[in-house]
């Protein structure tokens, strides 16, 4: 019986940088860790195609799940299509150590079912406004790691990173958060360390 792969759920609103994070993690870790990806889109496999086109991993290691309807249902109430995709990847690649599960774009209330992910990373972006951490919601308060992406846009949207950091601390208590600019790779190393340490990879 092969060892269960570590499953890391990556959630967050549309356009926050989930696919950018998935791609960056694949590029940084694929030489060291045997990995695969499941993406969720409502009606297309757009994110999966993007990852394949950018050579994130070999195409057969990326499965695009079309959720239809509400994307949060596929990661929460009825995770069966995602669990099936994970099962397919584990059968095809018995040595796989890490499977990233990227949710469809969602609201702040979406969370991953515990049976679907061992660790959850929630991505929000500065461009959505500095009040986002304050608004809370399970993604912000309960995820294992909160990623506040696109910090380069803070001056353009008049967002204060200090205010965001303060609000994230208030909402999350001891749970960690990290500021990132995934275009430049700023903060990526912290996310990788977190996955390695918490996931014992």
Curated annotation (Swiss-Prot):
Pfam families: cobW (PF02492). It comes from the Bacteria. PANTHER family: UREASE ACCESSORY PROTEIN G (PTHR31715:SF0). GO terms for biological process: urea catabolic process. It is found in: Cytoplasm. Belongs to the SIMIBI class G3E GTPase family. UreG subfamily. NCBIfam families: ureG. The lineage of its organism: Bacteria, Pseudomonadati, Pseudomonadota, Betaproteobacteria, Rhodocyclales. GO terms for molecular function: GTP binding; GTPase activity; nickel cation binding. Disulfide bonds: none annotated. GTP binds at residues 12-19. One of its GO terms (cellular component) is cytoplasm. This is Urease accessory protein UreG. Keywords: Chaperone, Cytoplasm, GTP-binding, Nickel insertion, Nucleotide-binding. Facilitates the functional incorporation of the urease nickel metallocenter. This process requires GTP hydrolysis, probably effectuated by UreG. Homodimer. UreD, UreF and UreG form a complex that acts as a GTP-hydrolysis-dependent molecular chaperone, activating the urease apoprotein by helping to assemble the nickel containing metallocenter of UreC. The UreE protein probably delivers the nickel. InterPro entries: CobW/HypB/UreG_nucleotide-bd, P-loop_NTPase, UreG. It comes from Dechloromonas aromatica (strain RCB).
């Amino acid at each position: 019986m092969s060892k269960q792969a570590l499953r890391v759920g990556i959630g967050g609103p549309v356009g926050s940088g989930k696919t950018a994070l998935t791609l960056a993690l694949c590029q940084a870790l694929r030489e060291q860790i045997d990995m695969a990806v499941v993406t969720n889109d409502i009606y297309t496999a757009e994110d999966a195609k993007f990852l394949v086109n950018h050579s994130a991993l070999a195409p057969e290691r990326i499965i695009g799940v079309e959720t239809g309807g509400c994307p949060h249902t596929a990661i929460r109430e009825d995770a069966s299509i995602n669990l099936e995709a994970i099962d397919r990847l584990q059968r095809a690649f018995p040595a796989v150590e890490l499977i990233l599960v990227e949710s469809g774009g969602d609201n702040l209330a979406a969370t991953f079912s515990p049976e679907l992910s061992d660790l959850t990373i929630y991505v929000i972006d500065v461009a959505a406004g500095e009040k986002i951490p304050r608004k809370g919601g399970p993604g912000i308060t309960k995820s294992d790691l909160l990623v506040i992406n696109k910090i380069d846009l803070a001056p353009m949207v008049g967002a204060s990173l200090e205010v965001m950091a303060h609000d994230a601390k208030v909402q999350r208590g001891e749970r960690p958060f990290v500021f990132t600019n995934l275009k430049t790779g700023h903060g990526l190393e912290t996310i990788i360390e977190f996955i390695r340490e918490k996931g014992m990879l």
